[in-house]
């Protein structure tokens, strides 16, 4: 009975082989081969292309005739680590992030290498491009960026709009906007909030004679549905669809820390005043200057000690990681503060901000500690806008941390080493390959696109986010403390003090904020993933010994830890991969990161951040001081002064264009609980049945989440903006839906 087949292409063009089905095999019926691969002319390959039937075998159980082919195919995919990779190659190998800068074009475009140095980083896929002249450690940027061929968007319509959209923003949209601003066709600043709202009503209009100088930009027609003089038209973001000023309320500001686009940073406040972990010799004393008096006026009769004891105080802390970079960031056109925000859990289950501390470096040197100021809620006169500005500085830090850490680092960059190790060490017939492979769809492609036009030197992120040229460097500083163990949702919640371990609770943890939409929905999804993984692992590994003797699995884990995440290889938290429990925990965590965690931090970007007033990405001026001309201007024209402080108009248009593309689902997206190729991904009935149960469970969870959103006693589910928290609904249509995993 055939277990594999070779294929040769004698044509000059490549073709995409989806699957092969052999019918009426004597004594066997039908055999399915799932291929999903581009086949080039056979001359470009060193060895013939082989595909295996959809049977699943541990290495020790592989039929003897197939063993040689199994090992050979893995060797082909690993390559030999040399040479520049070509379009048709299928080689997976590791490299450091040394292709973000372009030192040959000047020092302003040089960027440090991330990984293998004092700036640790997960590895990326190796391309083997030549090095730059100015820096022998940096790789030359190029138009063609190698990707193992089957990692490129191979599915048909596929997220192609993403690839093509991002490329078009930098190559087409940016130049038009730059010329329009330079030629005074667009005013440099928004004058008031109503002008921001106009973006969603009339869009950005430019004279036809100006637009006719440019070739038609297909993306503008397709994504921004514009015509005539309308250059860009944006759909109204969900956060303003019902109430245009909901974003200004304290309740919405607080709610977005637990149900917004960055819902996993807020922590329980365990000590008062909040302290810093920064070295006092280098940075002075960074203990917070927030006092009990600042808080107790709004604690409903409690003292700070009582509120901490009863777990009613929380902190959104954007202080320590930013301080060492703050002086450099503020030396550019941006001006900002490190922030600490204290929240109180009220009796109705909602959070209220009590105080915001803004800290900037001391003019006489870091060792003198920060210059800090504390702001408390105010709702009348100029002080109401001072408070609104204080919240805006907090959100700017939160936006940067969200984009560079919660989104890019924690759901994109850390996954790439798993993609590489899985392809290099686990055969396509290995059960763990089949379990994890669907969750890698497009990861390397999107990451490679990001390195080319989003997170590169002077790319879209550096242009539109406060951290500027330090954006990726700061994410490397934060990666030093990354741990796979903490990415598991229950561990993350306990570590942040927003849940406590409780064996009697449904998911083993009890939430401190009961109505915490991201956490309560997330635990349901986490549990469903874990149950599926437990069943799957038990089907193939009847004991821990079988797992310990699985040569491919052990090589996979060793390479992932020692090479893929090699800068952290000596950390004690890495599991040893000696038990089925280890494999379940690692696989569940990885699937969670690549599916639900990514959905929670990605698909809400436009619904929340599309209104720049709600999620500004840059601050350009410091807080006005009493008695200054800026303070008088704020009193006279508060909206204009607020807008002069946050993200500028040009940066806003670029930011909105990008996050609208990122927040969309493709028409052929595959959601959690679904598989490409239907039931043919494995020939084993047990896992197929378990997977169907997993799909059913997710559909049940979705019904439960819909009910929660209809429960008016759960105030954090919809908030003042009246936008139900739907980011962890498993299913979705295509487009901008604010849901879908």
From Swiss-Prot:
SUPFAM superfamilies: Lipase/lipooxygenase domain (PLAT/LH2 domain) (SSF49723), Lipoxigenase (SSF48484)
Pathway the protein takes part in: Lipid metabolism; oxylipin biosynthesis
Alphabetized Gene3D superfamilies for the sequence: 3.10.450.60, Lipoxygenase-1, Domain 2 (4.10.375.10), Lipoxygenase-1, Domain 3 (4.10.372.10), Lipoxygenase-1, Domain 5 (1.20.245.10), PLAT/LH2 domain (2.60.60.20)
Domain PLAT: 1-53
Chain ranges of the Lipoxygenase domain: 56-741
Biased composition (Basic and acidic residues): 133-144
Subcellular location as annotated: Cytoplasm
Main location: cytoplasm
Cellular component per GO, a single term: cytoplasm
Listed EC numbers: 1.13.11.58, 1.13.11.12
Swiss-Prot/TrEMBL GO biological process terms: fatty acid biosynthetic process; lipid oxidation; oxylipin biosynthetic process
Stored InterPro entries: LipOase, LipOase_C, LipOase_C_sf, LipOase_CS, LipOase_Fe_BS, LipOase_plant, Lipoxygenase_dom_3, PLAT/LH2_dom
Region feature (Disordered): 108-144
Functional summary from the UniProt entry: Plant lipoxygenase may be involved in a number of diverse aspects of plant physiology including growth and development, pest resistance, and senescence or responses to wounding. It catalyzes the hydroperoxidation of lipids containing a cis,cis-1,4-pentadiene structure.
Family: Belongs to the lipoxygenase family.
Protein name as catalogued: Linoleate 9S-lipoxygenase
Originating organism: Phaseolus vulgaris (Kidney bean)
């Amino acid at each position: 009975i055939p277990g594999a087949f070779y294929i040769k292409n004698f044509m000059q063009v490549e073709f995409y082989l989806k699957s092969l089905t052999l019918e009426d095999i004597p004594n066997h019926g039908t055999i399915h081969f799932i291929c999903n691969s581009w086949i080039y002319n056979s001359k470009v390959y060193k060895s013939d292309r082989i595909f295996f039937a959809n049977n699943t075998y541990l290495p020790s159980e592989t039929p003897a005739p197939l063993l040689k082919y199994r090992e050979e195919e893995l060797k082909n995919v690993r390559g030999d680590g040399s040479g520049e990779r070509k379009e048709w190659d299928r080689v997976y190998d590791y490299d450091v992030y040394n292709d973000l800068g372009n030192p040959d074009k000047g020092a302003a475009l040089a960027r440090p290498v991330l990984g293998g140095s004092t700036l640790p980083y997960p590895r990326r896929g190796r391309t083997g491009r030549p090095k730059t002249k100015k820096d022998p450690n940096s790789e030359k940027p190029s138009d063609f960026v190698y990707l193992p061929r089957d990692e490129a968007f191979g599915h048909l319509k596929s997220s192609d709009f993403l690839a093509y959209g991002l490329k078009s923003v930098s190559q087409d949209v940016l130049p038009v906007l730059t010329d329009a601003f330079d030629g005074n066709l667009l005013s440099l600043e928004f004058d008031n909030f109503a002008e921001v709202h106009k973006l969603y009503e009339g869009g950005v209009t430019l004279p036809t004679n100006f637009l006719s100088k440019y070739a038609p930009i297909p993306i503008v027609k397709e994504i921004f549905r514009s015509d005539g003089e309308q250059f860009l038209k944006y759909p109204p973001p969900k956060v303003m669809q019902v109430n245009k000023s909901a974003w200004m309320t304290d309740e919405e500001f607080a709610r977005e820390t637990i149900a917004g686009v960055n819902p996993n940073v807020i922590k329980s406040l365990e000590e008062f005043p909040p302290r810093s972990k920064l070295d006092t010799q280098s940075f002075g004393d960074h203990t917070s200057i927030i006092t009990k008096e600042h808080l107790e006026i709004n604690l409903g009769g409690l003292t700070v000690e009582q509120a901490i004891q009863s777990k009613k105080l929380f902190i959104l802390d954007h202080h320590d990681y930013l301080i060492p970079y703050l002086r450099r960031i503020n030396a550019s056109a941006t001006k900002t503060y490190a922030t600490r925000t204290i929240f109180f859990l009220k009796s109705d289950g909602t959070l209220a901000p009590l105080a915001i501390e803004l800290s900037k470096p001391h003019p006489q040197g870091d060792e003198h500690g920060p210059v800090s100021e504390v702001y408390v809620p105010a709702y009348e006169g100029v002080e109401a806008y001072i408070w609104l500005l204080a919240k805006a500085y907090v959100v700017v830090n939160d936006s940067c941390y969200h984009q560079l850490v919660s989104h890019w680092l924690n759901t994109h960059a850390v996954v790439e080493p798993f993609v590489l190790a899985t392809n290099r060490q686990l055969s396509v017939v290995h059960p763990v390959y089949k379990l994890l492979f669907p969750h890698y769809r497009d990861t390397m492609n999107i990451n490679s696109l990001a390195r080319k036009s989003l997170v590169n030197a002077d790319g879209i992120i550096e242009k539109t986010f406060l951290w500027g040229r330090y954006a990726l460097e700061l994410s490397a500083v934060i990666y030093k403390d990354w741990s796979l163990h903490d990415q598991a949702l229950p561990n993350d919640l306990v570590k942040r003090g927003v849940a406590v371990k409780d064996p009697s609770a449904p998911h083993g943890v009890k939430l401190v904020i009961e109505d915490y939409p991201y956490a309560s929905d997330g635990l349901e999804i986490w549990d469903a993933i874990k149950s599926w993984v437990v069943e799957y692992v038990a089907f193939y590994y009847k004991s821990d010994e079988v797992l310990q003797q699985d040569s491919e699995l052990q090589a996979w884990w060793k390479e992932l830890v020692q090479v893929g995440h090699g800068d952290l290889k000596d950390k004690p938290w890495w599991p040893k991969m000696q038990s089925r429990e280890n494999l379940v925990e690692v696989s569940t965590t990885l699937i969670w990161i690549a599916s639900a965690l990514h959905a929670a931090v990605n698909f809400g970007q436009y619904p929340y951040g599309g209104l720049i007033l709600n999620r500004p990405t840059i601050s350009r001026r410091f807080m006005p001081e009493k008695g200054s001309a800026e303070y008088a201007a704020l009193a006279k024209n508060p909206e204009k002064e607020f807008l002069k402080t946050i993200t500028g108009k040009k940066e806003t248009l670029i930011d909105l264009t990008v996050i609208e593309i990122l927040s969309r689902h493709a028409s052929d997206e595959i959601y959690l609980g679904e598989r490409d190729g239907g039931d043919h991904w494995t020939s084993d009935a047990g896992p197929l049945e378990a997977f169907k149960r997993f799909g059913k469970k997710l559909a049940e969870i979705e019904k439960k989440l819909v009910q929660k959103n209809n429960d008016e006693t759960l105030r954090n589910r919809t908030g003042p903006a009246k936008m139900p928290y739907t980011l962890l609904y498993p299913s979705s249509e295509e487009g901008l839906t604010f849901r879908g995993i």
